[in-house]
Amino acid sequence: MTSIIKLTTLVGAQEESAVCYLLQVDEFRFLLDCGWDENFSMDIIDSVKKYVHQVDAVLLSHPDPLHLGALPYAVGKLGLNCAIYATIPVYKMGQMFMYDLYQSRHNTEDFSLFSLDDVDCAFDKIQQLKYNQIVHLKGKGHGLSITPLPAGHMIGGTIWKIVKDGEEEIVYAVDFNHKREIHLNGCSLEMINRPSLLITDSFNATYVQPRRKQRDEQLLTNVLETLRGDGNVLIAVDTAGRVLELAQLLDQIWRTKDAGLGVYSLALLNNVSYNVVEFSKSQVEWMSDKLMRCFEDKRNNPFQFRHLTLCHGYSDLARVPSPKVVLASQPDLECGFSRELFIQWCQDPKNSVILTYRTTPGTLARFLIDHPSERIIDIELRKRVKLEGKELEEYVEKEKLKKEAAKKLEQSKEADLDSSDDSDVEEDIDQITSHKAKHDLMMKNEGSRKGSFFKQAKKSYPMFPAPEDRIKWDEYGEIIKPEDFLVPELQVTEDEKTKLESGLTNGDEPMDQDLSDVPTKCVSTTESMEIKARVTYIDYEGRSDGDSIKKIINQMKPRQLIIVHGPPDATQDLAEACRAFGGKDIKVYTPKLHETVDATSETHIYQVRLKDSLVSSLKFCKAKDTELAWIDGVLDMRVSKVDTGVILEERELKDEGEDMEMQVDTQVMDASTIAQQKVIKSLFGDDDKEFSEESEIIPTLEPLPSNEVPGHQSVFMNEPRLSDFKQVLLREGIHAEFVGGVLVCNNMVAVRRTETGRIGLEGCLCEDFFKIRELLYEQYAIV
């Protein structure tokens, strides 16, 4: 590679967790995904926090929380402020994921890590792209381009291709699926040939995946047996990703008369179910060819479900007759409707629970998958209840004090506003009278006439007192007081109003009362529960299996491979398989957590800082699209707080900028420099956190004194072709023609290419010889 490429694993290395990586390409830093696990581990936030202000762009691959869950927190709390790129479905469905996740947590606990406003603020920064749309970055990212390609895992799921200067190709492909499904086409990774670097995951490297037909039959059998036994089926799914595949599959099964399921109910239960289906209807062009043909030929939207009932809460679900199949979020059973239904239904042997997703280890769903024989578990029961008794009275008193304080503050502001308005009016009147006094044109006679001897009779006009009330205005116009528009019969007294606000009304409570309108608190208890219902894991994750992953990597033949996101044994298995079929042609890296991989293959490329005095003394010569200069300098090693930097070794230096390449002739301080490096490494190594976050050893190139500058032979670059040089000679009026591969000029000078590939000039020392030599020199960049 001709660029500096580094990858730092912030989250998701040698483990099954969220994914988040920092990719450095020269001076530009990408944050590849920004995921958060189901338990909202703050270790993930601490890892992201160290680098959040260095990030220049964020690339999101999938819409689920494991790929973008930490984005609202990073934007709202950590100050992440950069361009964020994602496909249109990832933008829309990602919002649905985060809305549902927040509401699921908020319904049963005091959740304050991020708010819905943080979600909106984060997603407002996203630049929405289409598949195969090439985006050329600007500024620090000049020369870089990014392209989203279909991943086949979720709607809008992306494989990112990053290209540097049309040469180096970096492919970021995690959680991809090459198989065609009902609602999605598979990815086409094999079309990418010989990338410089491939970053992929090993989540399924050792997983043996059953055939799709076998999984569908298992699902249908489970559902039929449970429903015919008068039981309910809970299918734990995500919010807006893989749930679309299951919804399509089940709705098609329900349409089939032979299945005999038409008499049973099918429901989708999450906080944003209606929005998810509506967004899906408008994104058919992102889905499989089969669904698109159905939509184009029959003009029938595939997400206009016939049998699937959309529910937003338990009251909606209660109206769906039993027995029923319920697709409920979240897939981890840690929160949301799926957890509540699991607690209600798991103690009835008639019911069935189907898990479709291997979530992070430590979650309830993953525990049930890994320990299918465990029938007694301790589970935390969380719920939000209304305040009662003393707690309610204290809450009402606090709210009353808050309202009084807010009212006083508002009144003081209004008083200040009135006084300022009155003073403005007085100033205006004073200004008018002063202007009248100064004005000497169009003066009436009464104003200048002196009083006469006889009293003049004045005509008086009777008037009623008319005090003028000043109307309050703000940015939106006149301020409206709601009490002015109340109907007298509907007005309530202050006591009744207080009772209504505090929830102390007489009579029965409504069955589906919204707890957000009354004061509540969250309570939790731990109970031991016996699982009597049938719990089954059926794989509908939508990922490629281990053998397919290995075949795809073998077809791509990447020069370098970085394996992330997977258990240690799966990571090692995939690495060994890739080394076996790739041999010496592939470098395989298996980084650990918080480890940085240097994927720069050219070992003579380094980053150095140039002194201004050195840059001002350089003499550049143009060579094609670049400018070259010879540098004579001395290296100074020191610790400096900068964003980038590389420890210099005793090798040739070559600094490549945006528009120039510099060939460096350096005098490296042999023993002293190496010793200094070792001392600095020992003093400010990885153990010292004060310097390990941003500080690195930066080689600074300083100019040599003029009396110490060594001479050097001229370097000829940009070798011309003889055919092109012939055209140059003809334009200058010199007759030139090829004779036996030798360019003969005016029958006096011969220009030939030697066996070593260099151009030689032969002939008598005449005026033509020196003119032709000068023209030949002009074709080179001489440094």
From Swiss-Prot:
It comes from the Eukaryota. Residues 417-427 have a biased composition (Acidic residues). GO terms for molecular function: RNA binding. SUPFAM superfamilies: Metallo-hydrolase/oxidoreductase. Disulfide bonds: none annotated. Keywords: Cytoplasm, mRNA processing, Nucleus, RNA-binding. InterPro entries: Beta_Casp, CPSF2, Cpsf2_C, CPSF2_MBL, Metallo-B-lactamas, RibonucZ/Hydroxyglut_hydro, RMMBL. GO terms for cellular component: cytoplasm; mRNA cleavage and polyadenylation specificity factor complex. It is found in: Nucleus; Cytoplasm. Signal peptide: none annotated. Residues 407-427 are annotated as: Disordered. CPSF is a heterotetramer composed of four distinct subunits 160, 100, 70 and 30 kDa. Identification in a complex with cpsf2, cpsf73, cpsf160 and sympk. Interacts with sympk. This is Cleavage and polyadenylation specificity factor subunit 2. It comes from Xenopus laevis (African clawed frog). The lineage of its organism: Eukaryota, Metazoa, Chordata, Craniata, Vertebrata.
